[in-house]
Amino acid sequence: MSTNINEEKCLEGDDIKYEKPDTHKNFWKSFGLNNEAGKLLYHLYGESNKIKPNILSSKHDGDKNKNDKKKEDAKLNTTYRKPQIHYPSLKKKAVKENPIDTIKHRKPLSKILEETQNYDCIKDIPISIGMNRETEKNKLHNIFVEEKCLMVPPSCAPMILTQEEKKEIIEKAQQRYIYINEENKSREEKHIQALRNYKLELIQELNEKRKLLQDIINEDKNIQGNISINQSDKRVSNKGNSYNIIQIKNDIEQCQKSIKKIEDNLNTYE
């Protein structure tokens, strides 16, 4: 009956407005404690409870909360800097102005003939050009400076030098010339002595080879003259001795050639 009376009262009233409570703690006052809704609201959002719903918060309050969150995020970003990771980047290759041609090109026949047409003229040039050039250099050197060092070198020729300075320069040049000649002579003597020693060694080796060759020939003759030895043994010994004889003869020829070369070199120094 009470609910019907309340419905009638609501229908009869023209301007029925819901009075929004000041805080969430006063939700239960809209319903009272006589019904279950009021009791539940009182237990949930009463003065003794700390639950704060978002029902009462307006749009303006929500915007404020968003701004506060943004400010907090900005503070966190300023205080704690995020680590920056630098990833390696591939460098682009520089474009060449004139790219290299990797294709193999064959020379045309006309180019080959042009490059080889002077071959007949070049091949007949004598090999002794270098020798002639060296002799000409030595002649000029002897005429210009080494003429017993009695001529002043061109670097000391100016008229600014006094007679004493020129005399001192000539004496120094003479001393240097004598030192160079002595050093060259000592080198030549050492070289000649080494060639002579090598020649003696080769002569000794040649005599040993000749003696060995004569011994092998005599041994071969003795084997051929002996009748008691089998024919197969004779053949084997003949093959071995013939091989040794050829090798020793080659060694003897090589020794003779080496001795001839050394004698020619020694004749140039005499």
Swiss-Prot record:
Q: Where is the composition biased (Basic and acidic residues)?
A: 58-75
Q: How is it used?
A: Possible candidate for an effective malaria vaccine as determined by epitope response in sera.
Coiled-coil positions: 182-270
Top-level taxon of the source organism: Eukaryota
Q: Which UniProt keywords apply?
A: Coiled coil, Merozoite
Task: Tell me yes or no: is Coiled coil among this UniProt entry's keywords.
Answer: yes
Q: Where is this region: Disordered?
A: 1-21, 53-77
Protein name per Swiss-Prot or TrEMBL? Uncharacterized protein MAL13P1.147
Organism for this UniProt entry: Plasmodium falciparum (isolate 3D7)
At the highest ranks, the source species' classification is: Eukaryota, Sar, Alveolata, Apicomplexa, Aconoidasida
